[in-house]
Each structure stands twice: as structure tokens, then as C-alpha cells.
């Protein structure tokens, strides 16, 4: 029997921060390697209601078939029970922070919510693989006020010290 390793990675962050756009970009970029369709359950106004799900096969490493399952959670606070459900069995996290200046407080609240939801599964945010994505960095070119990387680091990552990167989910 073939040995298989499944890895569940959850994209977490405030509503309209770019979680779904990340998965759509990955789906488009790696279409040839992804045999399955991306599953999205949307609500009014094209917002994620339940979750997005993108399964794909990375290939083989040391005789093990590696399967990755990417999920997003709904960003809106009213769907917190769904967020907890999606976090069950998580192996790693990408926290997608919205770089827009006016989203500063939402980022902080969303990260706090992630910590609390992980605790319901007796998981500690300090003991789980986590990467910070500072999204929408491209908006500065359009004259939209964005937070500096230093501010995002201070607000979200001063204690966690997780790896971080700047990004634009629409551009990759």
C-alpha cells in the first residue's frame, strides 16, 4: 500500500483580506498539477460563507505521496463557528493580514480570534507552523494608504516572530 501524507493548511484573516483570492491564484498558477476543482461556497455579495477548499498533489517525497489541502475561513465575525470547524485538524496556517490602513484594527481582532479558536482544540498559536502574509501591498501604487511592514510586524508579529512576506494575492 502506498504511503500518503495529508497536510491541511488554513488561510485565516479578516473579511475581504484576500484569502479566497490567494487560493484562486494558486489554483490558476498550478492548474496542471491540480486534478480537483476548487470548491467555494459563497454567500450574498460573493463573500465566502463556509470555506474554500483546494486539494492538490505535490508529488512524492521519500516514497510518500504528499497531498495538500488548502482551506480558507470566512472572515466575517458572525461565521466564527464555521472558522472553528475549518481549523479542526489544521497542520499549518497562513494569516492573511490586510495592509490597508483602515483595516488595522480588524487584523488585530482576527489574529486574537485565531488564537482563541485554536485554544478550543488545545492548540497554541506559538506551537503551530504559521506564516504571516501582508497582503495588498500593491495598493500603495494606486494611492491607497497602507500600513508599513514595521507597523504590521509590531501589531501582529512582535511576539509570534513568524516568518512573513509582503504580497498581492491578485498578482501572486
Annotate the PLM regions.
Residues 16, 76-77, 100-102, 136-140, ...:
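Conserved nucleotide-binding/hydrolysis micro-motifs of P-loop NTPases
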Residues 2, 46-49, 59-64, 84-89, ...:
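Conserved catalytic network of the ASCE P-loop NTPase/AAA+ motor domain
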Residues 79-102:
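Inter-motif core of Ras-like GTPase G domains
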Residues 92-95, 119-138, 157-166:
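Conserved beta-strand/loop subsegment of P-loop NTPase cores
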Residues 38-78:
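Switch I (G2) and immediately adjacent beta-strands of P-loop GTPase domains
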